[in-house]
């Protein structure tokens, strides 16, 4: 049908032109609503225009879809396409089929992807119509710039604040703790801080690079500076050879004159010395640098110039022995040395045929020369072997120092120097090839008659240590500003003295042989040992001790060499110092020493005890340290740590506690053996348990016992104290870990039992509830054992399941606080019952009333606490709830113990009553004349009369009534049996005893039962009074 319509069109060309005009017209109308030119009023006035514009836009969109290539690919005839679209539009079929597409087109029109001037209108502004498919594709191609802009390319990324709606930024947040502005500022700072630049994150590499460069430049600068100084001196010598040569010649002549003058005077008095000194010229000394031009002169001087150097060497060796003698008149110097010109090193470099000597050849030559003259070194007992090699980067000494070895003249001191010949440096870089093994210096033994050594830069040593100081004065100083001198105290002595000390020479020869077996070293004949080291250098890399001379005046050196390893850790391991120490040990105290550090960097070691070590090493009084790590094995039962409190109460010594190591039972009871403790009775709650432990040490000491009664843990409402009691072993020093129990001392048994010292109160601690008969005195002492306790012995012999007062069982570490409270209150109960022996019936009645009132007060407190806890159950933390539970346990235990105490008071009153009645019955059965001696008592008088009667009969000694003896203490819940006949039991059947089990299980019934029974049955007393009156009438 479509094909027929296309074929039926007569005027194709006219239709094409009309279609083109319609497309342009429709395009203008389609862009009009998108640009917003049409107002709502115009749309309401012209509804037909609006409908027409919508239809045209639909048609235009369909036309674009058709022109995109779908229909053109089927039929390339443009006229057919136009006719086909016109027929479809006329039939009105498009409106129902492309509804969804139009909706998407409307959404597309809201986002202007195409501009009217560039994309859409420009397509229709062309003069001609595309005739091919590539032209159509180019004609309908969208602008790539527009597409990229729509996708987000090419535009600046919007700030994060633009993505937040303005209503959130304009008003503050209603939520608490949130501030939008602060949040945004923090985010901005975070973005600024987190710089993606990796260079900022790895600035440490740059710092390390700077540090490395600084060290490298420092090392290079030191080497370069030394080289520059040397080159400068050489240039000056070359430029002005006459002046420099004259100065050097003058200086050498002055030195040689001094040496020659001393040589003549000393060799005249000691001919053997000159013979021994003649062998020293054969020991050469080579510079450090083997390629130095002066090497050839040094090697050649061994064979050719030995005779010329002999006076100089002899003069240097003679200085060692007779440097303290007065200087004699000058003698003519040897002309061979004075007239001999000393060429410069630069001249030698030109004249020497062996300038380019290899390093290996020089070393082999040095070793060969040294091994050839080793036998001569054995005969020189005064030569000091070389110390540690120098680790600094220094050039070799000048020519005259290498050959002549000038002496460093100091009053009484001969300096020693070590040349760089045997240095372990292979080049001038300053780094070692291998670390040389350190060798102890050897010093010949001196006689005790010589004066003490005065070291350079050191104070004179004590006169008492002068013999040892002569050998130990050789010390090394590290870190000095200039070249540090290692001074030797080899004083002048005769050759005969050296021969007498043959044993010392043998030991030294052996040590020298051992030293020679190590890496070879060449020793200068003039014994000058100049030790150079950089300032601040810390020679920690040197293995072994530095120097240790352990010898006294009667022993040769090397005897105490074994102590070197014992002391090397102490000599080196001193914090805060960058220097190694040289120690001196003596036989009298090899473990105790003191180190003094004077300002001149020399370290003196004296055999005294330092303040920091005398407490942990040696105790002169007790011969035993008071610290834990120094105690013997028998103190292993003590605690590993001691935490002092209140003025170091637990830090004691063996002398202050004489019975510390004695077993329990052997502790002296003498009051003079009390320890010098300062006891304070007002202790905090966390120290009460610790005081109980410490009180074990003061057992049986009169007047020094702590007031640590078993009721002390109850002086606070904080029940965490009971958990601290289980940890008391870590805070107190004690002899045995027994729990602190209450028991009477010997004085208590002699003078009778004492009343209760303190009463218990939950809220006030220890209130002074003073009732009739109460006496606040010193409580019974705390004890560890009861070997001498007659009360405990009587208890162990008596039958019954009652618990003992003096217990030895240890509280378990995991013991429940409730059980611990029960045990403590049980001890309180036993103590109270024991102290009731001296109480009267009226006092016991008063105490019973106090117990009842206290029980009522405790119930009121409990109700108050429960009400407070019910009001704030949610606000309580876990710790507060736990504390409340502990308080409840405490109140329950107190209530139970108060009920038990009330029962015991009533029981004791009944016992007193039965005892009185028994005494009355026995007196009534005796003869009437005995009854006449009875005092006249009015039994119906009341309480005061009862009290006087009871007191009268309580003092009468009787074996059946041990309550008056003061030696018997009833057990908790234990009823004392009395001898009563069946008739008496029948007449007094109203009196019944209640067991403590019933009292503990039910405190309420026990109190009610006690309340029902009075302390003294008035009817029973009336019967007794009637009997007495009848007997008196008879």
UniProtKB/Swiss-Prot annotation:
Coiled coil: 843-902
Spans annotated as Disordered: 223-290, 442-486, 624-678
Composition-biased stretches (Low complexity): 477-486
UniProt keyword annotations, A-Z: Coiled coil
UniProt keyword Coiled coil, yes or no: yes
Molecular-function GO terms, alphabetical: signaling receptor binding
UniProt cross-references to Pfam families, sorted A to Z: KRAP_IP3R_bind, SSFA2_C
Biased composition (Polar residues): 443-453, 465-476, 669-678
Identification of the protein by name: Protein ITPRID1
Organism: Mus musculus (Mouse)
Gene name for this UniProt entry: Itprid1
